[in-house]
Regions:
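N-terminal basic/disordered segments at the start of proteins
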Residues: 15-31
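Conserved phosphate/ATP/ADP-binding segment of small-molecule kinases
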Residues: 118-193
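Conserved N-terminal subdomain of the carbohydrate kinase-like
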Residues: 2-7, 27-110, 261
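Charged C-terminal helix
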Residues: 2, 53, 228-262
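Phosphate-handling active-site elements
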Residues: 29-34, 193-194, 220-234
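Short, small-residue alpha-helix embedded
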Residues: 20-23, 143-144, 203-227
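Short pre-catalytic strand/loop immediately N-terminal to key active-site residues, enriched for Gly-Thr
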Residues: 8-14, 193-207
């Protein structure tokens, strides 16, 4: 049977990130994607105009309709926005004993708009992350979660260890915000550090890279890949989406999720 993967996240009316990016990734990597939408956003390549939270009952209904019928082999979260939504999502994951949960703790948009309320951080860390298999914060998000500053590679390793010691979950810190010739991600599994390095591509068409990476990892986990292999394959896929990206709109352009489809 084709692997089943669920995204629990928000829409992006501009099509580059959020559930739109997740479903494109699932399709490109040949898994069956389902979606629980938690907020609607009005945004494009240069701004986020408004955010609308969906009622918790409707979020519950989406979970129930998917998991009572189709089921899932893995799940990922993206923008969840509020503590009420985060607590509800965590409760549904527990209720259905969902495995292979990947948390992308989306906090700030590419256009510098807050996508996670300040008072929701505690629920994100202490309720949702603690039931996950992997979290994938970028450097600014890792600073918030670890309550430390990250200025270099060693700081990334230190932050990853602090986070792991708090939540006992695999931590992948994405190094895309670190200004260097290479983009290095750091995985810490509680015992070892693993580095995943990629030459930086000179383009501003990077909208949705975090969503896409976490979706790709989730897809490979659903296919039975081990964590390090899933990350390595996902970074190869991401490199292709960036190298084959295209301009769309006046700001940060989207990735080309379908570059792998011949």
């Amino acid at each position: 049977m084709i692997p089943r993967v669920m995204s629990v996240a928000s829409t992006d009316s501009g099509g580059g990130a959020g559930i739109m990016a997740d479903l494109k990734t699932f399709t490109a990597l040949k898994v069956f994607g389902t979606a629980v939408i938690v907020t609607l956003t009005a945004q494009n390549s240069v701004s986020v105009k408004s955010i609308y939270e969906l009622p918790l009952k409707f979020i519950d209904d989406q979970f129930d309709e998917i998991l009572d019928d189709i089921g899932t082999d893995a799940a990922k979260t993206g923008m969840l926005y509020s503590s009420d939504i985060i607590n509800e999502v965590a409760n549904k994951f527990i209720q259905y004993d969902v495995k292979n949960i990947v948390i992308d703790p989306v906090m700030i948009s590419k256009t510098n708009v807050r996508l996670l309320k300040e008072d929701a951080i505690d629920a994100m860390v202490n309720k949702l992350m603690k039931i996950s298999y992997l979290i994938t914060p970028n450097m600014p998000e890792a600073e918030v979660i670890s309550k430390t500053k990250i200025k270099n590679y060693n700081d990334m390793k230190n932050a990853a260890k602090i986070i792991y010691n708090n939540i006992s979950t695999n931590v992948l810190i994405k190094g895309g915000h670190y200004n260097s010739y290479f983009s290095s991600d750091i995985l810490y599994d509680g015992d070892e550090f693993y580095e995943f390095k990629m030459k930086r591509v000179d383009t501003k068409n990077t909208h949705g890279t975090g969503d896409t990476l976490s979706s790709a990892i989730t897809s490979y986990l659903a296919n039975g890949k081990k964590l390090c292999e899933a990350i390595k394959l996902s970074r190869g896929y991401i490199e292709g989406t960036i190298k084959n990206s295209f301009p769309m709109g006046k700001g940060y352009g989207p990735l080309n999720h379908f570059w792998v489809i011949k």
